[in-house]
Design a protein with these regions (language model features):
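Loop-to-transmembrane helix entry
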Residues: 1-13, 129-132
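Conserved glycine-rich helix-kink/hinge and helix-boundary motifs of the Major Facilitator Superfamily
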Residues: 3-4, 41, 95, 99-100, ...
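Helix-to-loop junctions at the C-terminal end of transmembrane segments
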Residues: 17-33, 121
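A late C-terminal transmembrane helix in Major Facilitator Superfamily
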Residues: 18, 88-124
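Intrinsic disorder in cytosolic terminal tails and internal cytosolic loops
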Residues: 30, 149-164
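C-terminal transmembrane helical hairpin of 12-TM major facilitator-type secondary transporters
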Residues: 33-81
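A membrane-interface helix-boundary motif in multi-pass transporters
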Residues: 35-38, 118-138
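Small-residue-rich packing faces within the transmembrane alpha-helices of Major Facilitator Superfamily
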Residues: 45-49, 135-142
């Protein structure tokens, strides 16, 4: 029964987060060359707040609510990150760029993250501590996104010059 309360809302939240994040990222990109980075920054910071709220919640209902918000806000960055990657390379390099992007996200996010959470959980005796320990990556992600915001316009200009 818990799987239904966690899994189904998580799938719906992920769908909504990716879809809305992509639409917002594209709208922001039309206004500013680094516009999509704002969505990536949101996707790095907002989930951290909701994860803390979820794992310190006083009831299962609040945990489920904050878990949905964590997934929706975190997944909002995926489309923006993939689209930014595509924008930065010439068309002939998009397959390679996508492969590298997915290797990075798969190895870092889907392999190392759960391993580290499990390892820290085993050492501390607390699953919540294991999961909350992963929040150390949020400031790093935010700093990298801010750096990307600053450097992206020059990278876009270089790509345009290469295409000529």
């Amino acid at each position: 029964e818990v799987g239904l309360w966690v899994g189904l809302p998580a799938a719906i939240a992920g769908f909504i987060g990716v879809t809305m994040g992509g639409r917002i990222a594209d709208a922001l990109r039309r206004r500013h060359v680094s516009g999509r980075i704002a969505v990536i920054l949101f996707g790095a910071i907002a989930p951290a707040l909701f994860i803390v709220a979820a794992f310190t919640a006083s009831s299962a209902g609040l945990f489920f609510l904050f878990n949905v918000l964590t997934i929706a806000s975190g997944s909002s960055a995926l489309g923006a990150a993939a689209a930014t990657t595509q924008d930065l390379v010439l068309p002939r390099m998009r397959g390679t760029a996508t492969a590298i992007f997915f290797v990075g996200t798969t190895l870092l996010g889907l392999a190392i993250g759960p391993y580290m959470a499990g390892r820290i959980s085993s050492l501390s005796g607390s699953l919540a501590t294991g999961i909350l320990s992963l929040l150390v990556t949020a400031p790093v992600g935010a700093l990298v996104a801010l750096l990307a915001w600053r450097l992206l316009p020059a990278a876009e200009a270089r790509k345009a010059a290469w295409a000529e």
